[in-house]
Amino acid sequence: MAFKHFNPTTPGQRQLVIVDRSCLYKGKSVKALTAGLSSKGGRNNHGRVTARFQGGGHKRSYRFVDFKRLKRGVFAKVERLEYDPNRTAFIALIRYEDGQLSYILAPQRLDVGDSIIAGSNVDVKPGNAMPLGNMPVGTIIHNVEMKPGKGGQIARSAGTYAQLVGRGQGMVILRLNSGEQRLVSGSCFATVGAVSNPDHANINDGKAGRSRWRGKRPHVRGVAMNPVDHPHGGGEGRTSGGRHPVSPWGKSTKGKRTRSNKATDKFIMHTRHQRKK
C-alpha cells in the first residue's frame, strides 16, 4: 500500500496523509453478508453515556466477517478486496468451490484470484487457516483463537500479527505485538500471515472533521472541567490538576494495572510490562 498526499488547497489538506485504497473494490458490499447498524452515540439501553466522546459520524452497514473459518477442507477463491468502515483492516470476499460467499480478514500478500483453504493439514501460506499445533515454529499468524471454536480474538487490527515461538504438551507459545508471551491450546485455529493495511498507523487526518466522520467527538481534559465533572476540575486560572492523574471516577490512571482475570494468569508466561523494565 502507498500513501496519498494532497496539494494544500485548503488548510485541512496540508498535513493530510491517507492510505491509497485504489486497489480495493469500489462497489457495494454483498447484501446477504451485510446488516444495518444503528448509531448508539455511546449510550446504553437507559440512554446514559457509558462510553464518552462518541457520537455522530457517517452511516455504516455491518459486514459479517467469518472469524471461525468453520468450512474446512474446501478451497475458496479470493473474489475481491474491500474496505470495511467497521475496522482498520481490509476484508476479502471469498467464494468457496460450492458457491458460498464469505468475508474474511484480508492478510498481507493476499491478492485477487488466490486460492485459500482452512483445515488440519494445509500449506503454510497467507490466508490459510489451521490449528496452531500443526504450524511450524516461527510462523507469523493473525486472527488467533483463545478457545477452540470460539473464533479469532487476537491480532485482528490493521498490520498486527502474532508469532508462534514454541510448543509442547498440547499447547503453543505465542509472542504478541505488545511483547506478551502466552500459552494457547494447540487445537485453536489461526490464519497464516499478518493483517492487511499496515500503513494505517502512519495516516494523518489533517483536520478534526475526519475524526468526527468516524464518530469520534472531542476528548475533553479533566483540568478543563468543573469540580462537579472531574477530580481535576476547577481552580482559579489554569491548573495542573493538583494530584496524580485519575479517571473521572477517581481511579488512578497512567499505568495502574486493571487486569483481574486470575483464572487465565497461568497462561501468561511473560507479561507485556516486563519488556519495559
From Swiss-Prot:
Function description: One of the primary rRNA binding proteins. Required for association of the 30S and 50S subunits to form the 70S ribosome, for tRNA binding and peptide bond formation. It has been suggested to have peptidyltransferase activity; this is somewhat controversial. Makes several contacts with the 16S rRNA in the 70S ribosome.
Family according to the record: Belongs to the universal ribosomal protein uL2 family.
PROSITE patterns in alphabetical order: RIBOSOMAL_L2
Region (Disordered): 222-277
SUPFAM superfamilies in the cross-refs: Nucleic acid-binding proteins, Translation proteins SH3-like domain
PANTHER family per record: LARGE RIBOSOMAL SUBUNIT PROTEIN UL2M, RIBOSOMAL PROTEIN L2
Disulphide bridges: none
Protein name, as recorded: Large ribosomal subunit protein uL2
Keyword RNA-binding included in the entry's annotation: yes
Subunit structure: Part of the 50S ribosomal subunit. Forms a bridge to the 30S subunit in the 70S ribosome.
Cellular component terms per the entry's GO annotation: large ribosomal subunit
Keywords from the named record: Ribonucleoprotein, Ribosomal protein, RNA-binding, rRNA-binding
GO molecular function terms noted in the UniProt entry: rRNA binding; structural constituent of ribosome; transferase activity
Keyword Cell membrane: no
Listed GO biological process terms: cytoplasmic translation
